[in-house]
Amino acid sequence: MNAESHFKGWAKPGIIPPGLAAEIAVEPHETLDAISGHFRLFQLRDGHRFSTDDILTAWYGTSWCPSAHTALDLGSGIGTVGMICAWRLPGAKFVTVEAQAESVALAKKSARYNGIESRYEIREGDFRAPEILRADEKFDLITGSPPYFPQGAGIESGHPQKLACRFELRGNIADYCATAAKHLAPGGFFACVFPYEAAQLARVEAGARKAGLVIVRKRPVVFREGDSPLVGLFGMMRADDLPEWFRGQTWTEPDLIIRTREGRIHPEYSAVKLAIGFPP
């Protein structure tokens, strides 16, 4: 048992990537952080850091679309959602789209470190722009962790990465739904995360409806047992891919609880983390 194969008694699953042997340097303003199994992620030391919301989006999408051969991650940032999905779907080919050059550069370093460059394409640009995604490009699984708030709805960070991850600078939940609907393969699945408060939930539902999507399942996420859900995970499919009788229903799953009342990690969330190659 050593630090390369284990972490606090937990055996790291999955393939061992080339890592730093691929001649990649960790710059002073960067960190290199463990994600799934032996995969790692380059992040800015003082920039946007991956979150529980990102982790859950990847888990939800790959759990309910486990046989995907092609996948698209919208607004992919530094690559958290896409990298975890790629770890869980080792045979799938990925396209990710991100508008910020600095985040794209970090994601490319991570893809190289993790040895997935041949099946993981990172495109720089606004996913709403017609030149970014061809009309004929279709994907079995599409994921998105969109910004939650319109500009002016809260205190805005001065850091470009943090600002774009929180506020709707380039599209909102409706744009994510519209793009997903255009690029889902027949029977494809779109997974995203968004606030669960009533007004925000209404935005998800309106965006899905306008795009011709059906929210086939959703799961509220409670960060502390006993509290109200702060975010929800949503799984959508195109209405045209479903029988008419099914299009008007959504299965609401039990709350996913992150921490118990005492502050310990909830047993189910520990199991979720194990499923995506994280220590419990």
Residue ranges of model-derived segments:
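N-terminal auxiliary segments of SAM/dcSAM-dependent transferases
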Residues: 1-29
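SAM-dependent Rossmann-like transferase core, predominantly class I methyltransferases
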Residues: 23-70, 76-87, 235, 248-251, ...
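Residue-level signal for inorganic ion chemistry
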Residues: 57, 145, 176, 236
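Conserved SAM/SAH cofactor-binding pocket of Class I
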Residues: 59-144, 150-155
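Mobile active-site "lid"/loop adjacent to the S-adenosyl-L-methionine
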Residues: 146-176
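Conserved Class I SAM-dependent methyltransferase catalytic core
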Residues: 169-225, 229
